[in-house]
A protein has these predicted regions:
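Histidine-dependent nucleotide/RNA phosphoesterase domain, centered on the 2H-phosphoesterase fold
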Residues: 1-201
Length: 201
């Protein structure tokens, strides 16, 4: 077990709530990333790419959570899903946070569905507040994280390559459920294990 994994285990289970990406969109994103990573520049390997089998749109990151609180979080997910209808999402374009010049995260954007995603995040925040969680007042920014590049010298170049490759990306899907995931670190990119799923009403 890595130091990070040991710390997380001591603090609780690292949880987040997200909308899963369907397999057909995941396949298209995987092809895009494979193209960027296979461009022949060894600098691309310096960027820490996420596991593509666990792609998701994060609604709320909860962080280390005590085992006694997991059931309350799952209930909040159920209440949120029961109040939100399914909606359409379009993944399109790429970018970097906080900027291409100094990227910490590389991502694909949301061309349609951002308002519904933000409303879902607000509804989940309300449901979590009812069971004792602090509200997250930061603006919700819908995106699909593909890589972490903080402190990597080649980050800006890889960000530009991803943005160029993503210019033609337009992948629609129907958001139909909310999933409570556990993030398990150690031995490479984190694995995302679904703990609870609730269908949107």
């Amino acid at each position: 077990m890595t130091d990070r994994a040991e710390q997380d285990a001591a603090l609780g289970r690292r949880l987040f709530v997200a909308i899963p990406i369907p397999s057909e969109v995941r396949d298209a994103v995987t092809a895009l990333v494979d193209g960027v990573r296979g461009a022949g520049d060894p600098a691309v390997r310096d960027v820490r790419w996420v596991r593509l089998d666990g792609l998701h749109l994060t609604i709320r990151f909860l962080g280390p959570t005590d085992e006694d609180n997991v059931a309350d979080v799952a209930a909040a997910v159920d209440r949120t899903a029961g109040r939100r209808p399914p909606f359409d999402v379009v993944i399109a374009g790429g970018g970097a946070f906080p900027s291409v010049a100094r990227p910490r995260a590389l991502w694909l954007g949301v061309a349609e569905g951002a308002t519904d995603l933000a409303a879902t995040a607000t509804a989940l925040g309300d449901a979590l507040a009812d069971v004792g969680w602090t509200r997250d007042d930061r603006p919700y920014r819908a995106h699909l994280t593909l890589a972490r590049s903080d402190g990597v010298r080649s980050g800006p170049a890889v960000a530009r390559r991803l943005i160029d490759a993503a210019a033609a990306v337009r992948e629609p899907f129907r958001a139909e459920s909310l999933v409570l995931f556990e993030s398990i670190s150690g031995g490479g990119p984190a694995r995302y294990v679904p703990l609870h799923e609730a269908r949107l009403a």
